[in-house]
Structure formats: C-alpha cells, structure tokens
UniProtKB/Swiss-Prot annotation:
This is GTP cyclohydrolase 1. Its EC number is 3.5.4.16. Toroid-shaped homodecamer, composed of two pentamers of five dimers. GO terms for biological process: compound eye pigmentation; cuticle pigmentation; embryonic pattern specification; larval chitin-based cuticle development; preblastoderm mitotic cell cycle; pteridine biosynthetic process; regulation of epithelial cell migration, open tracheal system; tetrahydrobiopterin biosynthetic process. The keyword GTP-binding applies. Residues 33-59, 79-119 are annotated as: Disordered. The lineage of its organism: Eukaryota, Metazoa, Ecdysozoa, Arthropoda, Hexapoda. It comes from the Eukaryota. Pfam families: GTP_cyclohydroI.
C-alpha cells in the first residue's frame, strides 16, 4: 500500500490504529527501502531483525507436524525486554495475507482502546482525531461576528461605539486564523516531501516556536517544540516538521494532546523506528487568571518506538534537546 493511498483513502481511525503502540515497538522496525535490514539505533537492547523473526516463525510452523509454513495462523507473542522494561506485544505475520506486503506492521485484530479493561483512563493514538475538519469555516464568519457582538454587549460595552464597531468581525477573523489548522491536512502539508535516504541516525529539530489556544479558557499558550525521529530509509523535509507543529497547534488544544498528535503525524509520514516529541509551553490561563504564576512552564513529552523502549536512545535525544 503506497504512502499516498494511506493518507488519502484510509480513515483517521484506520491510520491511527495502524500505529497503535502495540504495533510500534522494536520487533516491527522494518525497512521501507530496497532491503529489509533492521534500522540501527544507539543501542540494540530489546531489538530483533526481520530475518530473525522470519526464521523463528518458520521454526514455529515446522513444529506443527504436517503443517506448511504458509498455513500457520499469525499469533501474537510477548517478548521479554532487558532490565525492568515491560514485555511488548509482537504481532507475527506470515507474509501471505493479501493486505501484507512486508513493508508495514500488521494492525492488531483487537487494538486497545479507552474501553479496554484496565485502560479506561488512557488516550490512544486512534482517539486523537488527526484528520478532524469542520465544514467550510469561512461561512461561519457572520455567525461568529454576531456572537462577539453579543459578548461585547454582555460586558456592558456599546458595540456601536467607534472603537468597537468593527471589533466583532475582526475578532471572528482572528479566531479563524488562530484555528486555521482545522483547514489543513497532513497529506497537503507534506506535499510529497518524503525522500528515500539511507540514513539511520537520529534526526532532531528543536526549538520550533508554537502558538495555540487553550480549549478550556480560549486564551493562548505558546512555547517551543523539539522533535526527533530515527529514520528507516525514509526522511522528511526539515521544514515539514515545523509545518506539522503548525497544523496541530493552530487548533483548540491541550498541550498533552498536541504533543501526541505531533508524534503520531511524524510516524504516519515516514514510518520511522521511533519518534520523540517534547513541548515546553507557557499558558496564559495560568498567567492572566487563576493562580497567576508568571514564570511557570509546562513540559510534556511523547516517546514512541525505540525512544520509549530504549533508555539510551531516549537519553541521547534529551541530551541533544537540552544542549545549548
């Protein structure tokens, strides 16, 4: 299945299901180039190559008397990791499935969701609505302007006085600009800027400026975003990382969800061995109101793939992000 078809023909839930974190870890680090060698990391702890997995699968198949390899149904297995890391679910495929071309991890038959016992309070990638897009938003401008006019009247102001007579329309246009990310899709922003490249070391772009709107109080929060990923023979144009930040920050947001959405979008774009995102934000809802803590900052992170499973890879990324 081609990358273009993935984005244009699959629904948001299908795209996000495909990278649920049961499918992301080390044993599914697959090459999308001309060979199937596993992508290298700063540490090989807990990883296995594609050839090893295929050999193990063949051995399991021949253990069943009289059963050819191709007839053995795929079965999930828990792979123990080094140290105190938790086991991860590895989905084995036999390559004969019509929807499996060997270039992409297979989606779990029953992906975990917030309704799965024990995960009621969790947010999974398929819950993030990356492709949410409302109806034509420019058509909402008159209604939005009328709402702002009512708001001014509710404050005891005269919306017809000279300084405010055009304020409702200006405020409505400003709000449309602040949330213009709803009008953008990942496919449009990437615009084909995904390139074959035999580069298997970490790529980090840090201190990307970000502005967003808190969905709780409709006041701004702003800060910086740092993104790192470990390529699997695919790299992304560097400016596209900043544009991905722009898509999701220009929406009504909470910082935690914004961080996840950026990480999932990079994963969809280049299917890397792992993605790491750190966001540092200043929230005006904490500065202008409430506790009024002017110097407070909020830091959130999302680690996927090797960045989540390999402490050395994660440490390397954090050192690069924190270096001056």
């Amino acid at each position: 299945m081609s990358f273009t078809r993935q984005l244009s023909e699959m629904s948001a839930s299908e795209l996000n299901d495909a990278i649920d974190d049961t499918n992301f870890p080390q044993a599914h680090i697959l090459s999308r180039g001309r060979n199937n060698s596993v992508c290298s990391t700063s540490s090989t702890s807990g990883t296995s190559s594609l050839a090893d997995r295929q050999q193990n699968q063949a051995e399991e198949a021949t253990a069943i008397a009289g059963t050819p390899v191709e007839e053995v149904a795929p079965a999930p297995a828990l792979v123990p990791l080094a140290g105190n890391q938790r086991p991860r679910l590895i989905l084995k495929t036999n390559g004969s499935s019509p929807d499996s071309d060997g270039t992409q991890p297979k989606t779990p038959l029953t992906p975990r969701t917030s309704t799965t016992p024990g995960h009621e309070k969790c947010t999974f990638h398929h819950d993030l609505e990356l492709d949410h897009k409302p109806p034509t938003r420019e058509a909402l401008l008159p209604d939005m302007a009328r709402s702002y006019r009512l708001l001014l009247g509710g404050l005891g102001e005269n919306p017809d006085r000279q300084g405010l007579i055009k304020t409702p329309e200006r405020a409505a246009k400003a709000m449309l600009y602040f949330t213009k990310g709803y009008d953008q899709s990942l496919e449009d922003v990437l615009n084909g800027a995904v390139f074959d490249e035999d580069h298997d070391e970490m790529v980090v772009v840090k201190d990307i400026e970000m502005f967003s709107m808190c969905e709780h109080h409709l006041v701004p929060f702003y800060g910086k975003v740092s993104i790192g990923y470990l390529p699997c023979n695919k790299i992304l144009g560097l400016s596209k990382l900043a544009r991905i930040v722009e898509i999701f920050s220009r929406r009504l947001q909470v910082q935690e969800r914004l961080t996840k959405q950026i990480a999932v979008a990079v994963t969809q774009a280049v299917q890397p061995a792992g993605v790491a995102v750190v966001v540092e934000g200043v929230h005006m809802c904490m500065v202008m109101r409430g506790v009024q803590k002017i110097n407070s900052k909020t830091v959130t992170s999302t680690m996927l793939g090797v960045f989540r499973d390999d402490p050395k890879t994660r440490e390397e990324f954090l050192n690069l992000v924190n270096s001056k």
